[in-house]
Design a protein with these regions (language model features):
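Metal-dependent catalytic neighborhoods of phosphoester/phosphodiester hydrolases
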Residues: 85-91, 204-206
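Core dinuclear metal-dependent hydrolase active-site scaffold
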Residues: 11-14, 26-32, 38, 128-157
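Metallo-beta-lactamase
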Residues: 45-46, 55, 59-82, 97-141, 147-207
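Zn-dependent metallo-beta-lactamase
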Residues: 1-39, 44-47, 178-192, 201-207
């Protein structure tokens, strides 16, 4: 069966962080699928002393007039603080994350802000490897930035679109891939890759 043609990806800026002296955006991504509305990562909703040195400037989903109730499924690419800080807004709804990522976030010190991961009512669905989330929507492990990082592959036509989280932090990491995850994403021959900390999607260089 062919994937639906009407799957769209929309980036939403939810924060800025100070990294190496420059402001770095934080985006989450909404995937509108005929069968469900999927949110990839949840950004941040509050400040925390553990990341005060990054001078977060927040514009969380719940302050943007975003339709929180309209989200059916949440995917965490990984559980660093700037990707899971809004998980509590979706308490009771399924949040898909790789089991290894969840285990690391729960057991390793200084990995994340643990109270954000373990917010009351948050319901994780641990994933082991690849998973077809919906027709035309796949979760694929892409280790590198973290051991349990995953990306979302959207089959929209001849070539897929990837929502990659931090599989790469900047475009050069996909231009010249090194990690297992980056190599795996490039092997998909994607049309474009949305990243958390870039304003525009990465596209393959044309000769």
């Amino acid at each position: 069966m062919n994937a639906p043609a009407s799957i769209t990806v929309t980036p939403i800026r939810v924060a800025d962080l100070l990294a190496e002296g420059e402001r770095m955006p934080v985006y989450v991504h909404v995937i509108d699928h005929p069968d469900a509305r999927v949110l990839v990562d949840t950004g941040m909703t509050e400040l925390h002393p553990a990341v005060a040195d990054m001078d977060p400037r927040l514009s969380p989903l719940n302050k943007q007039g975003f339709d929180l109730a309209g989200i059916d499924i949440v995917v965490n690419t990984h559980l660093h603080f700037d990707h899971c800080g809004g998980n509590h807004l979706f308490a009771g709804r399924p949040i898909y994350v790789q089991r290894r990522e969840l285990d690391d976030a729960r057991s390793e010190d200084d990995y994340t802000i643990r109270e954000w991961v373990e917010a009351p009512g948050v319901r994780y669905v641990p994933v082991d490897g690849e998973l077809e989330l919906l027709l035309g929507l796949r979760l694929i492990p892409a280790p590198g930035h973290t051991r349990g990082l995953q990306v979302v592959v959207v089959e929209t036509g001849d070539r897929p679109v990837v929502v990659g989280g931090d599989v790469a932090v900047w475009f050069g990491e996909l231009d010249e891939p090194h990690t297992e995850g980056q190599l795996r994403v490039r092997a998909l021959d994607p049309e474009l890759v949305w990243l958390t900390h870039e304003h525009e999607p990465w596209r393959p260089r044309t000769v």
